Amino acid sequence: MTEIRQEMYKVILYVQNAEKSGIDLNMINFVCRPDINGNIFQLTEAIARGRAKEALRLLNILLMNKEPLPLIRFMFNRHIKQLICAKELQNERDLIKQAKIHPYAAKKLMQQINSLKMSDLEFLYHQCFLSDWQVKKGLMEDRLSFETLLIKSSLTFANRS
């Protein structure tokens, strides 16, 4: 609720300073920061369906919206960990209680795990680790490493279909 209040405050300040007479959807999209969580769900879905091009498009949207790549990487890694927890627990209530995940996110995670096997999630987690390691060791630039992660994972899933 606090985040919504802050975003509304930004829109109101923008309207006042730009001397606009009203608020429209374009103005909200211009001023407000999009929700990264929804994009991370979509990014994971694109990978699981073997759609590298879609995964890269979603990454570019996040980057164009000025989301920092380390945050995107962190959110993606966290999402994979949450999917592993969801797969292990197999119960929305347990996921909410034990992993302390918001009920809406838990519901979406439970839906997303239906199309993924535990071995798929372990593969993704390992790819996240390797990508992060390459960056920290200076073997690869951050963006290239993450794009490679998306492409390699997507192609692996595409070849399984």
Describe every region a protein language model picked out.
Residues 1-45, 49, 133-135, 142, ...:
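Non-catalytic interfacial helical region
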Residues 2, 64-67, 137:
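Residues in soluble alpha-helical coiled-coils and helical-bundle/repeat scaffolds
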Residues 19-123, 157-158:
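Small-residue-rich helix-loop
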